[in-house]
Amino acid sequence: MAQDRKKVLVLGAGYAGLQTVTKLQKELSADAAEITLINKNEYHYESTWLHEASAGTINYEDLLYPVEKTVNKNKVNFVVAEVTKIDRNAKRVETDKGVYDFDILVVALGFVSETFGIDGMKEHAFQIENVLTSRKLSRHIEDKFANYAASKEKDDKDLSILVGGAGFTGIEFLGELTDRIPELCSKYGVDQSKVKLTCVEAAPKMLPMFSDDLVSYAVKYLEDRGVEFKIATPIVACNEKGFVVEVNGEKQQLEAGTSVWTAGVRGSHLMEESFEGVKRGRIINKQDLTIEGHNDIFVIGDCSAFIPADEERPLPTTAQIAMQQGEHTASNIKRLLNGESTQDFQYVNRGTVCSLGANDGVGIVYGRDIAGKKAAFLKKVIDTRAIYKLGGIGLAFKKGKF
C-alpha cells in the first residue's frame, strides 16, 4: 500500500545528493519508497566549473540547469526549500517551507568557504563558493577593466588580482584568468603589461596531490602567462587594500584591486548543529557511509569525512568521490528497503585533472601523469560525463563541453 512506503529524504542536489536520487529512480519502482529531494535552489550547478564562471570565461548560466530536468516526477517529489534543522532522533527535518519526516535520510548539503579565522578575509575577499559569488566576481573583474579604461587618473593596482591558495581551485581559476585577461585587455584597450596576477600560498608546495614534474609544468605554464607565485607565504589578514602576508617574521601589505580566497572549504554549518563529532562541517562515516548510532542516516559529499578501512586520513572532497558515494548510497538504500544488509563503500580513484585554462592542464589518470592538451581534453570528457550521469544524454549534449 502507498501509505506503507518508507520515506527516503535527500537533502541537497549537488553531485552526491542528485546522484543518489537519479540512481534510486532508475532502480526503484514508484511504489517502492516515497522519495523527497530538498534543495535550496531550483537548479543544480556544476561546482567544478565555478572557477570558469568566476573568471568570466563562461557565463554563469552555462554551469546550471533545473533539477526538475533530472528527476522523474512519478517517483521523486522535488521541493525547493532551505533546510533549517535536522532532528536525527525524531527523524524530522525542518525547512523554511515545512517539516518533513523520514525513515531514511541522506545528508548531502555541500560546502561553503572556509577562511580559517583569517582577519578580514570574509569581509574583503571574494569567495568562489556558488553561482552567485562567481557571477559577482566575474562582473567585478570586468568592471575594474572598464573603469580603468574610462578613468583619466589610472591606478595600475586596479588591474592587480591577488589569489589566496595554490590548490585545485586557485590554480584552475588562475588558468582561466590567463585566458580571460587578454580578452578584457582587447575589449577595453588596456595594456596587458599593466595587469598583475599574484598567487599566495602558505604551504611550501602548490598542488600537493601532484608530482613535482606536474607542479613544475603548471608553474611554468602560468608564469609564462604572467602569474607570479609567492609560495610558503602565509596570509595573516585581508583588508580593503589586499592581503597582509608574513615574510621572515615580518608583515607585508600586498595591494590589489581584487582579492580572491580559494584556499579552503568546509561542510555545511548545519552539520555542527545536527550531529556530534563534526569538524569543519564534516563527520566521520562508518564504512557503509552511514554514521555512528544511526544506520538509517547517510552523510555524503562535502559533509562526509570518509576514512577507508586501510587508511588513516579522510578522502578529499571531490566531485568524483561525491558521485561514487551517491551511487553507493542509492544501492544501500535499496538494500535497506529490501530488508538486506548494507555494503561497505569502496572508492575507485580513476584520476584527477587540473585545468590550466581551456586548452592545457595537468593530471593523474589511473596512476599515470598527463599534461598539456591531452589533459585539457580529458578534463572536458570528465565534466561532460558528470552531466550525463546526472541528467542523461540530452542534457549532456546541451550542457557538455563538446
UniProtKB/Swiss-Prot annotation:
Superkingdom of the organism of origin: Bacteria
Matching InterPro entries: FAD/NAD-bd_sf (IPR036188), FAD/NAD-binding_dom (IPR023753), NADH-Q_oxidoreductase (IPR051169)
A matching Pfam family: Pyr_redox_2
Active site per the UniProt annotation: 172
EC number in record: 1.6.5.9
GO-annotated cellular components: plasma membrane
Cysteines paired by S-S bonds: none
Amino-acid positions noted as binding FAD in the UniProt annotation, renumbered to this chain: 12-16, 39-40, 83, 302, 319-320, 379
Co-factor remark: Binds 1 FAD per subunit.
Protein family membership: Belongs to the NADH dehydrogenase family.
Protein name: Type II NADH:quinone oxidoreductase
Organism of derivation: Staphylococcus epidermidis (strain ATCC 12228 / FDA PCI 1200)
Organism lineage string: Bacteria, Bacillati, Bacillota, Bacilli, Bacillales
